[in-house]
């Protein structure tokens, strides 16, 4: 068996998956907290919130300076993973994040001290694909984790290992089947 866990490049490697796995540019920013203890892990959790401006997420200040914030589907920019400029953060990118910080986290509405560009790989329904390729059942695909697959790595690993070793899977994986598209 062959296992593809090629992230944003899966649609390029397996063209039949191009419309099922869409790489999207994502931007995160770290805003100066002025050393406020309010944004440290003991007082401030990892969070996500749905507000009229979108679905934001963030992290407390931990191991590097700044309160981290991002917006799911940042500017809705689908990208070619080979052509993404990971070094370019625009004024518009910063403004999208700053608007949220100023509205909901005013104590961190300071200088953006660091920014980072990455990719999320989304499926049309935003659920993962973990399945065999129907035309080539010896090939397994695990992709479309949209920046949060790491939270599920133990169970995804178990599913992929079961598929690869042709062992019985004790979990219902219908929601991850590629046939849903």
Where are these regions (language model features)?
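Active-site substrate-recognition segment that forms the wall
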Residues: 4, 8-135
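C-terminal catalytic lobe of FAD-dependent flavoproteins
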Residues: 99-181
């Amino acid at each position: 068996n062959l296992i593809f866990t090629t992230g944003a490049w899966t649609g390029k490697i397996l063209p039949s998956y191009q419309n099922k796995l869409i790489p999207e540019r994502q931007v995160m920013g770290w805003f100066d907290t002025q050393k406020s203890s309010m944004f440290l892990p003991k007082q401030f959790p990892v969070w996500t919130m749905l507000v009229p401006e979108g679905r934001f997420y963030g992290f407390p200040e931990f191991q590097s300076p700044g309160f981290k914030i991002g917006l799911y589907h940042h500017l809705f920019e689908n990208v070619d993973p080979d052509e993404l400029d990971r070094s370019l953060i625009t004024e518009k990118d910063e403004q999208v994040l700053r608007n949220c910080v100023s509205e909901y986290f005013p104590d961190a509405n300071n200088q953006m001290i660091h920014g980072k560009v990455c990719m999320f790989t989304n499926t049309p329904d935003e659920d993962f694909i973990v399945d065999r390729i129907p035309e080539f059942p010896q090939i397994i695909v695990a992709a479309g984790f949209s920046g949060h697959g790491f939270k599920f790595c133990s169970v995804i690993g178990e599913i992929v290992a079961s598929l690869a070793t042709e062992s019985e899977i004790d979990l219902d994986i219908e929601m991850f089947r590629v046939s849903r598209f």
